[in-house]
Amino acid sequence: MTATASFRRPGVRHLCTMLVALWCATAAAQPLPAAGTAATDSGSASASAASAASAASAASAVSAASAPADDVTSHVCVADGGPSGRPSIGLALSGGGARGYAHLGVLKVLEDNRIPIDCIAGTSMGAVVGGLYASGMPAEDMQKRLSQIDLADIAFDVTERADLPQSRREDERYYINGLTLGFGAKGVKAPAGLVQGNRLQALLADWTAAVPTNQPFDRLPIPYRAVATDLQTGQMVVLDHGSLPLAIRASMAMPGLFAPAEINGRALVDGGLVSNLPVDTARRMGADVVIAVDIGSPLRPLDALASPADVMQQMVGILIRQNVTSQRKQLHAQDVLLTPDLGTIAFTDFQSANQAIAAGAAAATAALPRLKRFALSPADYAAYRSAHAQPLPPPIRITRIDIKTSGGVPKRVVSDALHVKRGDIYDPKQVSQDLLALTTGGNFESVTQQIVSRGDDNVLEINAREKYWGPNFLLFGLGMSSSSTDEGGFRLHVGYRRPWLTESGLEFRADTTIGSDLQSARVELRQPLPGAYGLYISPYAEYQRRYVNLYDDSGEVKLNQYLMQTTRTGLDFGLPIARLGDFRMGIGYVTGHGSPNYNLPIDDTSGSLFWPTFSSQALTARARLVIDQLDDPMFPRRGYFTELRVERSLWSHNSQSTQEFGDGISNTPYTEIYGKAMIAQQFGRHSVSATIEGGKSIGGTNLINAFNFTLGGFQHLAAYAADQLTGNELAYGNVTYMNQLMTFNASPIKALSVGASAEVGNVWSSGVQVGGGVLKQSYTFFTSLSTAFGPLYMGVALAPGGRRNIYLQLGRTY
């Protein structure tokens, strides 16, 4: 039994359309297998003669699966149950993505009419449905289980944001999900597929827990074969033994989108490239009668090919249709071909599952006049179902745990994540849950687990594979802003991650922002500490260069602009709080330097001094708690967020020139407190979120923290320019309503929404009573697109007094 813990490839599903086009172009550029390979010979085999070419094809395909070379026709498809001499019935299920739900409808009609299935061959989605059914799972049970999950999220490795470690959630605020490059001694690399298929394999492992590992698929309740393609040679590979979940995943690994599955040293991908309707495979298993279900997408009319991606997708569709046509020609007179009318259901349209199931049932019902001749009596069929039921797995007590790692992955990292120990009863679900922290951390290609029994020795094998496109990783993000109240700007984010520098798990992290209004850099080491709870120690250094606008007391008249440069070095101790968030505390040394951009007098009085250049230093102790359970950091529809930060200066010094700012600036120690809370609740396609935020400096004021709090910009008093209001005391509140008008499958755009928000708040300088004066208001009406590259929002914000701001922004960084 094999199970795989999951990790998130957030945003990947929204890139599906582009990747399909890439797959199409790649597949179309490959030459068809030459004569003598599995694909050509299988396609040219005659339906009435076992020619030498056909025999060579069968031998090639079977030997590719490590079966005996002389086992050209295995004859494992035996009529089991019913009257003596009845024909053995094989089921050939084609690939087609979400259209494959039609297979469930076919199976339900066959069950209702007591038509037995003696062997199954499946490709891609047909391999998924066929493999589960072959393991003994009834069609009704399969439909119920599939209806309780989001198969699209599972297939595309989408993990709930709340299940990610806090470091990954923080990265999401700056970097594009799924856009990660690796580099090493051999140069820059990218993953062979954006989706590793871990969640799907884990789900299949859970649902097939009764199936022993590394056994022939002939021993399943129904003999089974999965068809895949060797990525290197283009040959058809018929998988007939080993890990059932891995065989299924290999059969549906669409090149470019899903990473190849490695089996016996071969990189295997979607079998639809060579045999999307595996009639010949079912025949070689010994089926006397083949029920073939073709769910392939029809070719599109010429006027529907509106883009290069459409043309490339049509190209690969033609190639797949050719191998399907070849397989259909191998059907005999007694065979039955079903072609459900699936209309425009796309291969990614998992939301149309019920429609696809109904189409499959309708096609099978229409063919009942030909199918009923194979029906068994009620008594015979009851005996057949009993013999082919999914067995309950016996309890297995773990006698040994064997951890295998690749690359620079320390075994300690894996062992620390496991709570299971020798002598425990094996529970694949629990082990997968233990490994969740590893796979969702983003540093692994896969973490698989299986139990291998040899007599009384039951070994739990864990295989943790480092991402082969590492060990160094680059992350990228982009933010752009344009509005009617300021100049607009951009921010480009580049991150670097290097895990496992040492056997103890030391990680190096670096983040850089280059923007029109902000430049920053941060480097950090994270060293896990021995023991439980995930404690770590983190020395760091950071630099920030930003522009701060200074306004008069009304917040309307711009007086000057300061270039602020700050550096901070420090040492933190960190503690992850389960999957809720993170707590850090430590000590740091901060320096700051400010210089005015404009050589102007401070006021209009005669002899007034000019705005000064200043410098400040401070030694501080800081603690920060973050709890983040939002489903999206910018447009949350459900969840909650809390941040609490306290910083105390142990020593503080300002340069003499800071006296020009008045008596509020001093070398007296200060304490800065900041808090933010947000909650979001979803009601169908509607959602409401509320935010409160506040901050205050107590004691002296160092110019390093004099401009820490800002308001202005989208969702932060949107009627005002970005960071227009600056001070060291803050109060702010926000209520936002959103209506998700539509969602998109397999598109760079995830959702289209409209919304409105009401905001109130202000900032104050030191010594001014918080809440004194007028609280500024802003009312925003916006349209938002949630995209693979970050949120895109446009709208208008209004405020009393005729103030308004029209804006267009991309990214989460403004």
Q: Residue spans of the language-model regions?
A:
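Acidic/histidine-enriched alpha-helical segments
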Residues: R300-L302, K372-A389, Y589-V590, G639-T642, ...
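Solvent-exposed coil/turn segments that connect beta secondary-structure elements
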Residues: P138, S147, T229-Q232, G242-L244, ...
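N-terminal secretory signal peptides that target proteins for export/translocation
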Residues: M1-G11
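Gly/Ala-rich beta-loop-alpha elbow adjacent to hydrolase catalytic centers
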Residues: G122, G126
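Patatin-like phospholipase
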Residues: A29-A49, S60-A121, G131-L436, T440-V447, ...
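Bacterial N-terminal signal peptides
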Residues: H14-A27
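C-terminal outer-membrane beta-barrel translocator/porin domains of Gram-negative envelope proteins
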Residues: T440, S446-T448, V459-E461, F473-S483, ...
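Gram-negative/organellar outer-membrane beta-barrel architecture
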Residues: P428-D434, N443-R624, T710-L711, Q715, ...
